[in-house]
């Protein structure tokens, strides 16, 4: 079982790339499970709704995210690939955590069964100019979109910070999300082949 995760700010094209990868796996008869965080199944979608509508403090949010995460991982059936739409990097990147809280997150990540640590994480990186352009085209945004849009630089810095932390053998790949959807998809497939995750 190989785990892949997708990360990036809203409007980076993350959902589009996940759909393209899903089509690629189906076309090539690769058995895969696609899920998202927070959420992932009927019960955990309820936790997702609580998180999105809440005003919890940082520690409570960390506990909610990891309770949901551990429950999701224990429910996943064996598959060739598990693909996450957001994983622990988002937990680290989005909130205004102090150094003590960040250490707690890393400690909790290290409690995750090694088989669930991603072999590769794709971070779709978008500059603020392109992000604003895409945001203005979108009709819908949730509470987190609105809340964190003004914190772009801090979130990007946190993504770069966690990318340098060694977590198992995972490879953290940053891709220019301003490229066309097909160009980004090609880079994703190329990196999966480079890492010998697919042929």
Regions found by a protein language model. Give the residues of each.
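Hydrophobic anchor at the beta1->P-loop junction of P-loop NTPases
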Residues: 6
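NTP-dependent small-molecule kinase module
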Residues: 22, 129-199
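A glycine- and Lys/Arg-enriched "phosphate-lid" helix/loop adjacent to the NTP-binding pocket
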Residues: 91-157
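Post-Walker A helix-loop "phosphate-sensing" segment adjacent to the P-loop in P-loop NTPases
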Residues: 23-32
